[in-house]
Amino acid sequence: MRISKPHLRSVSIQCYLCLLLNSHFLTEAGIHVFILGCFSAGLPKTEANWVNVISDLKKIEDLIQSMHIDATLYTESDVHPSCKVTAMKCFLLELQVISHESGDTDIHDTVENLIILANNILSSNGNITESGCKECEELEEKNIKEFLQSFVHIVQMFINTS
């Protein structure tokens, strides 16, 4: 079973390590290990998180196969690399439409997890300002299948540049 919040995996591993090495914290070397462990818990692990985002997108795609959701979503199909953050924010907003339209708890939970992962990655990159990009409402409306394919494409753009 996959942990639904993979960004917490490294923290839990480091907590176990802390308990294991607890008796050694009385030495100077033990204190250094503890401090370095605390710092490493906060370091971004963007490549792994983007892979988890793609995994969640595939899960959403599988879950909606059995449903009939007749929604059109604003979709950026030809993302310029200088507008990928703006496009990603639009995709994340439209994901909430899928969650609402489906009414399915599995889809809702997967969408929430995906949004948390993506927002954590985007926030770890700092505040990037992009100009000359289309607003979400200016994008072409497409069906859910095309939306998810375009979403995977933009996530792969983030993976390839990290």
From Swiss-Prot:
Keyword Signal attributed: yes
GO MF term list: cytokine activity; cytokine receptor binding
Secretion signal span: 1-29
Entry keyword set: Cytokine, Disulfide bond, Glycoprotein, Secreted, Signal
Glycosylation sites: 127
Biological processes annotated in GO: immune response; interleukin-15-mediated signaling pathway; neutrophil activation; positive regulation of cytokine production; positive regulation of immune response; positive regulation of peptidyl-tyrosine phosphorylation; positive regulation of phagocytosis; positive regulation of T cell proliferation
Pfam families: IL15 (PF02372)
Keyword Glycoprotein: yes
GO CC field: extracellular space
Removed propeptide positions: 30-48
UniProt-annotated location(s): Secreted
Domain of life: Eukaryota
InterPro entries in alphabetical order: 4_helix_cytokine-like_core (IPR009079), IL-15 (IPR020439), IL-15/IL-21_fam (IPR003443), IL-15_mml (IPR020466)
Disulfide bonds: 83-133, 90-136
UniProt similarity note: Belongs to the IL-15/IL-21 family.
Task performed by this protein: Cytokine that plays a major role in the development of inflammatory and protective immune responses to microbial invaders and parasites by modulating immune cells of both the innate and adaptive immune systems. Stimulates the proliferation of natural killer cells, T-cells and B-cells and promotes the secretion of several cytokines. In monocytes, induces the production of IL8 and monocyte chemotactic protein 1/CCL2, two chemokines that attract neutrophils and monocytes respectively to sites of infection.
Protein name, per record: Interleukin-15
Organism field: Macaca mulatta (Rhesus macaque)
Encoding gene (name): IL15
